[in-house]
């Protein structure tokens, strides 16, 4: 796109986001700053992104008929999936018919909607290094896979889930049945199927934000952000920092793996490529064809954060992945199960040097639901991490009243 219309006019450039959580909210804001008319879609009303979009729509996005009807009604120029639980088959059908352009592509949305599609692409089609794995449809198959191939310890994850839900570590035979039950409770849509992975002896894991954007000649170019280190607990991100130091050879291999995966998925936009690293060895873990939760740190570290990069790339605009300052992020959890919570300690959090916070505006809190994030920058990334954790600890969510 080189010409942009005026929002809420007959010539508006319209973008529809499928999924309107905290990441989608930031993408919507970035799009609006470029004069784009936005449509925020989610499965529940008053989702964070719906609070800032021009239009808010609530449907079951995994229902093909509902999804098709909404796209045909709104007639967006671009459809941007921000979550996995979407009727991707319908997106492929509409894209093939020329009804809409899907970001990055409908095929990429389908392959990355669950762990099976993308793992088979990476390991079997592209021959990239990954952990050993088996897909299982029952507790019996899971036990057989562990006994015959994977061994202990191992990790079990639902084929489809988000933010670490349903993921657990199996150390001993007695852990297998509880892990299966936990995966069934935490999975989305593809209930009854899991991936069991052998442990990779890695030193650290990173997210490599990889951006496919048009160059001056109109051809797609690949750009890399500085590697993002992150800490996960039970598969859920709790802290991230940028840059994470890496050996030159490991960084080069990371670029090669990320380029191979994103070239195959094709299209334009930001891809969050997760990798395990030990010394100069690198293993592919997962990829999301959209901004990544660990990439929220870029709100304080890059001249163009991951959401601005995504907005620019999908609109065909130039991007800049340069680092502005080292920095860190730390998650603010809900801490309570309640609707319409309030937050104490915000002023105290912002008194921590070089910090900022984002409160997501989710209408309902759960004990382990991400309700906000603290950000901090500093020339020393370890200082930034300390400040981000401190700021996050000072924000105290509670039930209202």
Swiss-Prot record:
Enzyme Commission identifier(s): 6.3.1.21
UniProt keyword annotation of Transport present: no
GO CC annotations on file: cytosol
Binding site for ATP: 115, 157, 162-167, 197-200, 205
Reaction(s) catalysed by this chain's protein: N(1)-(5-phospho-beta-D-ribosyl)glycinamide + formate + ATP = N(2)-formyl-N(1)-(5-phospho-beta-D-ribosyl)glycinamide + ADP + phosphate + H(+)
Pathway of action: Purine metabolism; IMP biosynthesis via de novo pathway; N(2)-formyl-N(1)-(5-phospho-D-ribosyl)glycinamide from N(1)-(5-phospho-D-ribosyl)glycinamide (formate route): step 1/1
Residues noted as binding N(1)-(5-phospho-beta-D-ribosyl)glycinamide in the record, renumbered to the chain: 22-23, 82, 293, 362, 369-370
GO MF entries: ATP binding; magnesium ion binding; phosphoribosylglycinamide formyltransferase 2 activity; phosphoribosylglycinamide formyltransferase activity
UniProt-listed GO biological process terms: 'de novo' IMP biosynthetic process
Pfam families given in the database record: ATP-grasp, PurT_C, RS_preATP-grasp-like
Binding, Mg(2+): 274, 286
Keyword field: ATP-binding, Ligase, Magnesium, Metal-binding, Nucleotide-binding, Purine biosynthesis
All copies of domain ATP-grasp, residue ranges: 120-315
Top EC group: ligase
Subunit structure: Homodimer.
Similarity field: Belongs to the PurK/PurT family.
Stated role: Involved in the de novo purine biosynthesis. Catalyzes the transfer of formate to 5-phospho-ribosyl-glycinamide (GAR), producing 5-phospho-ribosyl-N-formylglycinamide (FGAR). Formate is provided by PurU via hydrolysis of 10-formyl-tetrahydrofolate.
The protein's name in its UniProt record: Formate-dependent phosphoribosylglycinamide formyltransferase
Gene name of this polypeptide: purT
